[in-house]
Regions:
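Active-site nucleophile-adjacent alpha helix/oxyanion-hole segment immediately C-terminal to the catalytic cysteine
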Residues: 2-56
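Catalytic-core signature of thiol
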Residues: 38-72, 78-82
Length: 131
C-alpha cells in the first residue's frame, strides 16, 4: 500500500504497521493494546507484535477482515470495543480531507480507536485499517 500524505495521518497519534497487508485490522488492534510495550524503533514492524497475537482470539476470523467480521471478532474478544472513524480520501479534495466518526462496536469499557481508510485503485475499492 502506498503511504498516505495527510497532516492528520502524518502525526504521532496515528500510525500503521508496515507490511501487515491483509492483517492491517489485527495489527491495528495489537498496536493499540501493546505499542507502549514495544521499542519505538520497531513498533511499526509486524514482527514486534508476534508474541502478542496469541492474546487475541481470532478463531474463525478470515483476513483481510471485512466489516461483517468485526462483530464476530468482538464476540471472540469480549473485553474489547472498537470505535471506528472513516477516512475517505477520494470523496474530499486532497487539501480538505476529513475524518468522520462512524460508530462504536462492542460493550466493553476498553475502546480501541481504529481509522478505516477507503481508497480506490484500478477501479477497485480497497480498505486499510490504522491504529
Amino acid at each position: 500500500m502506498e503511504d498516505i500524505h495527510h497532516p492528520v495521518l502524518n502525526n504521532n497519534s496515528i500510525f500503521k504497521v508496515y507490511q501487515s497487508k491483509d492483517e492491517s485490522f489485527l495489527y491495528s488492534i495489537l498496536a493499540a493494546l501493546y505499542s507502549n510495550k514495544i521499542d519505538r524503533r520497531s513498533f511499526h514492524r509486524p514482527s514486534a507484535y508476534e508474541k502478542y497475537k496469541k492474546t487475541l482470539n481470532i478463531k474463525n476470523i478470515n483476513f483481510p477482515i471485512r466489516n461483517k467480521d468485526i462483530v464476530p471478532f468482538l464476540q471472540n474478544n469480549p473485553k474489547l470495543s472498537i470505535a471506528i472513524r472513516l477516512f475517505d480520501s477520494v470523496v474530499i479534495s486532497e487539501k480538505d480531507m476529513r475524518i468522520y466518526e462512524y460508530k462504536v462496536i462492542g460493550k466493553s469499557s476498553q475502546v480501541i480507536n481504529i481509522l478505516f481508510h477507503k481508497y480506490y485503485r484500478n477501479k477497485k475499492t480497497l480498505y486499510h485499517f490504522f491504529g
